[in-house]
Amino acid sequence: MAVDPVTLAVIQAGLQQVCDEMDLTFSRAAFSPVIAEADDRSDGIYAAEDGALIAQGARGLPVFVGTMQFSTRHLVARIASGETSAPEPGDIYIVNDPYLGGTHLMDVRFAMPFWRDGRIFCWLSNTGHWPDTGGMVPGGFSASAISAEQEGLRLPPVKLFKRGVLDREIWQIICSNIRVADQRIGDVNAQASALIVGAERLGLLLDRYGDATVAAAIAEMRAIAARQMRAHLAAVPDGRYVARAIVDSDGVVNEPLVIALALEKAGEGVVFDFAGSSAPCAGPMNSVRATTVSAVYLAMRHVFPDVPLSAGAFEPFEIRGIEGTFLDAHYPRPVSGCAAEVSQRIAEAVFAALVQAIPERVPAAPAGTSGNFALGGHDPETGRDFVMYQISGGGYGGNADHDGLSNGCSTIGISKAPPIEIMEQRFPVLYRRYALHEGSGGAGRQRGGFGVDYEVELLRGQARASFVMDHGRVGPQGALGGGDGAVNRVEVIRDGQVMVPEHLSKAQDIPLAPGDRVRVRTPGGGGYGPAAERDPEAVAEDVRLGRYGPEAARRLFGWRG
């Protein structure tokens, strides 16, 4: 069935609007600041037969673009095999199993079948980052976990809502295995409500244009996305481009992990070969296949953002060589660092390879860490336990035309640090500092952007801090002769003494007492092009604004001021 261009455009925009409304509903109704303020969530529409991506909200985390279609695919397959009970109208499944198309345990997915005339037309699904899903440490970021069980509660696909009603028995099992369980029902209701709103809006779209027309439009959208991506790839010079990226350590063995990438471009297709990457690791920096593949998709979306979000956009890609490496984790390997950290190293490797081929389109490496900092304890003023989860921005890499953005969100999405006023209101902490990490941008013709420098103090009670970050050993890569960005630095300050974690950017279960402080300085982006070619007036302006000190400007840029 052919769909005329005008109708196709309207339906495509309508599907996007459905996803955007789900995103907004989820954020506005959520209880947790990490969802309501930091936007660590995503919503989308997926094919009934195989979970392929149809549309995804523009306000959600792009890293979920791949993982949510994989988790939906696993759900569909398990229903077909009888491992998971068959759906009925009003059912909503919950799943967070990383090995079934997921990321880490804190990313909890809901999936709801959308019914038309007694059959499933498509799936609506969303993901939200829960502040805690159990495990060794509050917040789930166990830097020294050596098995999945130590990271928290792992849920296979199971119905949390049956015919529109919350299954209290399943909910009690979940609540019995997570911290601050009394605070999660607000997020659960928000997550389910987002899907219900999506179903209402999608139903109106189908009523207006008809099921057959919308189905034909979806098929055409997928074909168009594939053609557009192939057209972009055809303009990339054929060749083999080799790059690598470094993960500081796995949190258990204090040695770097290597992501090796050979990007082979021929015609309208591209192969991403990760053979030679490090073996599976003991600690939580393993990556499940869905996250690895999604990170490649994400990186290519950064380079070619005009290609519509659809499964068709990824058809020209072949990803291989991950078997037997830490980029293809299987149970029971721990994986809490994969979604927020390893995924960004994978994207960095893709950028480092592609900048050799199309330097005008690809930047130097961004900060590439989400700055995961979890603080859990008891607040004597409220008489309640708490789990605080802080993410933070960093510098973007310079590019052919501009300096890198400062304090930008991470490579994997749009998540931003929650406002400190909200954090201070909700948790027993005080932010003593929140500023740019001066001097952190990598030197270059176009310098990297600057990271963030913040310091937070525990005001009362007792708490325990955990960190799973990266780029503490090696800063974000410069490109085409540019310098690397500054490394990530974590400090715990107690009675005037400064403690730096053994693994630099990873540690867990550090006890904090009132007056103890945590200071985090996130990386700057890599520089682009030789620093000696930077406009002297631009260097002088950076010095005037305090972005670099005079001595640093002379050393890095050869400034004569």
Positions of predicted regions on the chain:
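Glycine-rich phosphate-binding loop of nucleotide-binding enzymes
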Residues: I92
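Glycine/proline-enriched, intrinsically flexible loops and inter-domain linkers
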Residues: M1-P89, D97-R116, I120-G561
